[in-house]
Amino acid sequence: MNRTQLLTLIATGLGLFMIFLDALIVNVALPDIQRSFAVGEDGLQWVVASYSLGMAVFIMSAATLADLDGRRRWYLIGVSLFTLGSIACGLAPSIAVLTTARGAQGLGAAAVSVTSLALVSAAFPEAKEKARAIGIWTAIASIGTTTGPTLGGLLVDQWGWRSIFYVNLPMGALVLFLTLCYVEESCNERARRFDLSGQLLFIVAVGALVYAVIEGPQIGWTSVQTIVMLWTAAVGCALFVWLERRSSNPMMDLTLFRDTSYALAIATICTVFFAVYGMLLLTTQFLQNVRGYTPSVTGLMILPFSAAVAIVSPLVGHLVGRIGARVPILAGLCMLMLGLLMLIFSEHRSSALVLVGLGLCGSGVALCLTPITTVAMTAVPAERAGMASGIMSAQRAIGSTIGFAVLGSVLAAWLSATLEPHLERAVPDPVQRHVLAEIIIDSANPRAHVGGIVPRRHIEHRDPVAIAEEDFIEGIRVALLVATATLAVVFLAGWRWFPRDVHTAGSDLSERLPTAMTVECAVSHMPGATWCRLWPA
């Protein structure tokens, strides 16, 4: 490994480290962000969902543009946009600016994630050096995701929530300097054309759906605004499918979904990310707003999830090679559902059960991600493997975005339906009760301003804080049950339709690909996990 190769590896690894760090670091800062801007559950959902939404809508087009215009160029664009977005997040004077800046971060992260590994692959043409470099690159990125919640908690406790964004500035500047000075350009002369119409329709469909799901509990599911957004999403999706089926250079090749194994693998991976990222959002809020933990302690409490993913992931590839993909997928889904059920029934008990539940969730995720990728990539022709991999990347981001939106909205809807009637046991005055319920729901905090709204002498029988905490716990339980139910549906479908004869480990997929393609091990958007990404040589 010469000096240029080493610095290329550092530049690409640090870029990926930044975007993976921000995938989870924001969660522990949400209560502080809420207090700064006085926003409700929907505002917090937008803060976390806008990042993954930006990635979801742009990741496939970013790969095409990078192949056409140069991967180094788009890596620089991605890092620059991500860094500028971080500055805007840190300086944000309102929740609207913060949400917009998070979306810009997501767009930059999409460009970084699809170009980083390609630049490493081009810098190390020799097979053994390439494998070693990718191992180091993967480790650097994994550190970002496994340490994100813990580092975020420490930063928030010491310097406030804005510091979690400012920490990206020196790293971004270093990555830009190293990339400009040492990273060589590469591109793909056979890349397909950029599908602008498909990209715009994809943004409209996904964006309208996420907006309707997040805002529905606040503005009403039958309101004109919600109905218009749902119809916009439906029409946008229909037009997108119609256009992509007729395009000679589609952004998303929908004919791949004719294969049952591939379609089921995509549905499974989307559902896993839906459940896990929604769970992480709700668990973080529970630990801080109900248990009263500080951000740093909350970050440490989340660590078993990330650690389990990091520990189990490297072992799964060998397991798939020996026993096939079907058993690890189904076992991983079972373990993930068991972890969610443990979280559902652990709120009133010891923190140890929460830690065990998070560890089971992490182990289940790690156990099923690699074999799902194996099933998907062995189900498609070799010449379409790049497109198949790109669709998987987009569906991961879409799953996490919808998870934030749906599970957060389930909690908000539960509180809207139950909190005010339950508060009648403690606050008999209907005006005070209504105002208190609205403030608790809007602040997403069961302890919010109780003393300032209801004087102690007006409280009867029950403590309103205790009632609100019980409703929050029940709302989180309902949301996690929704996540568990979606996983159960996918499990039953997998039991019926996942193939029984897929024994090809991710590292062996190169045997079935033409020499024009190289198969590399990339880090997914899940902490510590690895998956297969295919790059044109």
Swiss-Prot record:
Belongs to the major facilitator superfamily. EmrB family. It holds the Pfam family MFS_1. GO terms for cellular component: membrane; plasma membrane. The gene is stp. It is a multi-pass membrane protein. The chain crosses the membrane at residues 6-26, 46-66, 77-97, 104-124, 136-156, 163-183, 200-220, 223-243, 262-282, 300-320, 327-347, 352-372, 397-417, 478-498. Contributes to spectinomycin and tetracycline resistance. NCBIfam families: efflux_EmrB. Keywords: Antibiotic resistance, Cell membrane, Membrane, Transmembrane, Transmembrane helix, Transport. GO terms for molecular function: transmembrane transporter activity. The keyword Endoplasmic reticulum does not apply. It is found in: Cell membrane. It comes from Mycobacterium tuberculosis (strain ATCC 25618 / H37Rv). This is Multidrug resistance protein Stp. CDD domains: MFS_MMR_MDR_like. GO terms for biological process: response to antibiotic.
